[in-house]
């Protein structure tokens, strides 16, 4: 759906669908959990939901009453080992300032995908879901994403860090380039679901099961060490 603030009604853009089903969703329409716009190329937006694929659409090609081709993504991302999986779905997406796409999976990990060379020219067809076209890059692990819908985000003036909540109530911060965990903070007594960075200053807002929103800000330039119980907190995917 598209909402124009100048209009009193919403506009249907496309139907996100799949030809196969899984435990979470029967064949047909894909239930969506996350929609993000690429700020660098604002007519591209990515969606993720009840299957394993993050799909990228060009809003200029989206017309509800047009041909079926208008419902086809211009690109599709999925880790190779999850292609065809019936047990995972996407809970959160985020675009970096350089068009990298961050994808968080339920009962799995977080993956960073680069904008590949075929992004603009990939045919609008089922071939978009060919594993040969899917390029996995960095992987971020240690958090637990099972109980609720977890968001994911970037942090830093140049998106140097990756953020995620966890079922253990902690906020995880990894250095993007090395995929190395650098901060682990208690953000909720139960679960941390969402994290949002201020666009201009190093402030971070988080929320979870508790009835409040927490605002975080750095107190100094020194990076504190990880807590002594870090090994007890980290979740290892089996």
Question: Predicted regions: what is each one?
Answer:
Residues 1-70:
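Solenoidal tandem-repeat scaffolds enriched in leucines and small polar residues
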């Amino acid at each position: 759906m598209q909402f124009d603030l100048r209009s009193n009604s919403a506009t249907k853009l496309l139907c996100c669908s799949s030809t196969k089903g899984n435990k979470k969703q029967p064949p047909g329409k894909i239930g969506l959990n996350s929609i993000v716009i690429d700020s660098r190329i604002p007519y591209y937006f990515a969606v993720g939901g009840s299957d394993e694929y993050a799909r990228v659409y060009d809003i200029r090609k989206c017309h509800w009453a047009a041909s079926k081709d208008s419902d086809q993504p211009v690109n599709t991302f999925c880790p190779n080992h999850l292609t065809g999986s019936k047990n995972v779905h996407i809970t959160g997406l985020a675009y970096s300032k350089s068009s990298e796409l961050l994808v968080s999976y339920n009962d799995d990990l977080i993956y960073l995908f680069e904008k590949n060379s075929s992004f603009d020219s990939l045919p609008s067809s089922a071939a978009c879901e060919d594993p040969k076209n899917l390029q996995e890059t960095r992987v971020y692990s240690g958090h637990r994403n099972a109980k609720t819908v977890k968001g994911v985000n970037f942090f830093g003036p140049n998106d140097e860090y990756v953020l995620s909540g966890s079922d253990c109530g902690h906020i995880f911060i990894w250095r993007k380039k090395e995929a190395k965990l650098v901060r682990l903070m208690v953000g909720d007594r139960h679960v941390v679901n969402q994290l949002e960075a201020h666009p201009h200053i190093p402030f971070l807002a988080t929320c979870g099961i508790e009835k409040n929103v927490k605002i975080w800000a750095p107190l100094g330039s020194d990076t504190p060490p990880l807590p002594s119980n870090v090994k007890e907190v980290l979740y290892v995917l089996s």
